[in-house]
A protein has these predicted regions:
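A short glycine-rich, Lys/Arg-flanked "PGG" loop and its adjoining helix->strand segment in the class I
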Residues: 111-123
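Class I SAM-dependent methyltransferase SAM/SAH-binding core
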Residues: 41-43, 47-87
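Conserved class I S-adenosyl-L-methionine
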Residues: 1-35, 49-53, 57, 72, 126-154, ...
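Conserved Class I S-adenosyl-L-methionine
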Residues: 19, 47, 172-240
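A conserved beta-strand element that flanks and buttresses the S-adenosyl-L-methionine
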Residues: 99
Length: 240
């Protein structure tokens, strides 16, 4: 999994974190899996956006955060374990849900990660992903201003590649809306080249041109920025 340095971690927190109000559709989407008394592993927890969200949304759920980057763990200010998808520092059969938000495209060995997921999941447990997939990106407004960023999609897996690579079956797939920013002006103020896999594929000139397009649109357009990421729920093959 990708590791971030201290500068990137700080930029990530500025550029990528979204208000809990903006994520309310995600609360509703995952609620069926976050049952009272369950244990959730936030795998690749970053700077802790969803650790905080789950604590507020589901106070009867225990969340364990694992993050490979020391800089991200430090920036979060939260208790987190060092680890990654291919080496999860938890006992066998210890969690009911594995949550992975914008993480799976960073996983280098899906087969090894799948074995680890099955190891730590209890019987009947699920893997819940919030992600962008190569063939499902029309709901991301970033491409309107930074069209060249689409070339980075070649490094993102498809839904089938994720399910097959991890060795799980698809139980649910749907696009979930989120208010990424209250306005294009807010989005423009927080966009960071170093904080986004898609933007990191751009040259300095491409990034500058895209930011100029974003600023020009922000000067005349009002209203919230709404993007759609996919909810993918995976179950063990045969549902065991």
């Amino acid at each position: 999994m990708t590791r971030y340095d201290a500068v990137e971690a700080a930029s990530y927190r500025v550029a990528r974190e979204i208000s809990l109000t903006g994520l309310s559709s995600w609360r509703d989407a995952v609620a069926p899996y976050f049952r009272p008394g369950s244990t959730v592993l936030d795998l690749g927890a970053g700077t802790g956006l969803f650790v905080r969200a789950f604590a507020e949304w589901f106070p009867d759920v225990t969340v364990v955060a694992v993050e490979p980057s020391a800089a991200m763990r430090s920036a979060s200010g939260l208790p987190m374990l060092a680890g990654h998808a291919e080496a999860i520092p938890l006992p066998d059969a210890s969690v009911d849900v594995v949550w992975m938000s914008t993480v799976v495209h960073h996983v280098r060995d899906l087969t090894a990660a799948g074995a680890e997921l099955r190891r730590v999941l209890r019987p009947g447990g699920v893997v819940v992903l919030r992600s962008l997939f190569r063939e499902r990106h029309s709901g991301i407004g970033l491409f309107r201003f930074f069209p060249e960023a689409a070339r980075a999609l070649s490094s993102f897996p498809t839904v089938a590649e994720v399910a097959d690579g991890l060795g799980f079956a698809v139980d649910r797939l749907e696009a979930v809306p989120q208010v990424t920013a209250s306005s294009l002006a807010e989005k423009a103020s927080s966009v960071r080249w170093e904080a986004d896999t898609l933007l990191r594929s751009l040259s300095p000139d491409e990034f500058s041109a895209g930011r100029a397009r974003l600023l020009a649109a922000a000067a005349v357009e009002t209203g919230p920025v709404v993007d759609h990421l996919d909810l993918l729920v995976l179950i063990t093959v045969g549902g065991v």
